């Protein structure tokens, strides 16, 4: 344990906070071929693979996910929320942060109802989260 004198001479350093979604905090300068710091809430990307994954231990399901190459050339795994989707290889999607707790390596969500992703059909509640238009009366 340090003495007060030692702490006065060299104070404690606080830990730097790590980002939960690091791929959204990078931009890519294609002229210089180098990364820049550029925080963004969402990024556009192209699906390179669409498939299913099994969750961690107590849960059992086939969770839909897509491998996405973002506009900054970083490849990530992104979860496809909701029931049913129209995504396939080369679909252009919008990606936001937010991990899926029972899927290791999935730290991003695809935004439903944006770009090539359709909204969830027949959804009546929480429609804005799933990109569903208001039903006609």
UniProtKB/Swiss-Prot annotation:
Signal peptide feature range: none
Record GO cellular component, one term: small ribosomal subunit
Keywords carried by this UniProt record: Methylation, Ribonucleoprotein, Ribosomal protein, RNA-binding, rRNA-binding, tRNA-binding
KW Repeat (keyword) present: no
Pfam families: Ribosom_S12_S23
Transmembrane segments: none
GO biological process, alphabetically ordered: translation
A GO MF label: structural constituent of ribosome
Region Disordered, annotated ranges: 1-28
Residues recorded with modification 3-methylthioaspartic acid: 102
Family: Belongs to the universal ribosomal protein uS12 family.
Quaternary structure and partners: Part of the 30S ribosomal subunit. Contacts proteins S8 and S17. May interact with IF1 in the 30S initiation complex.
Function: With S4 and S5 plays an important role in translational accuracy. Interacts with and stabilizes bases of the 16S rRNA that are involved in tRNA selection in the A site and with the mRNA backbone. Located at the interface of the 30S and 50S subunits, it traverses the body of the 30S subunit contacting proteins on the other side and probably holding the rRNA structure together. The combined cluster of proteins S8, S12 and S17 appears to hold together the shoulder and platform of the 30S subunit.
Protein name: Small ribosomal subunit protein uS12
Organism: Staphylococcus carnosus (strain TM300)
Gene name per UniProt: rpsL
């Amino acid at each position: 344990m340090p003495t007060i004198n030692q702490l006065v001479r060299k104070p404690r350093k606080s830990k730097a906070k790590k980002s939960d979604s690091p791929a959204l905090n990078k931009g890519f300068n294609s002229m210089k071929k180098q990364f820049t710091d550029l925080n963004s809430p969402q990024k556009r990307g192209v699906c390179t693979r669409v498939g299913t994954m099994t969750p961690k231990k107590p849960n059992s399901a086939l969770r839909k996910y897509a491998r996405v190459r973002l506009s900054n050339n970083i490849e990530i795994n992104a979860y496809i929320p909701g029931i049913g989707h129209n995504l396939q290889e080369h679909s252009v999607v919008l990606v936001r942060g937010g991990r899926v707790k029972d899927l290791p390596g999935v730290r991003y969500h695809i935004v439903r109802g944006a770009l090539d992703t359709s909204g969830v059909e027949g959804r009546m509640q929480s429609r804005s989260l799933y990109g569903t238009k208001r039903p006609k009366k």
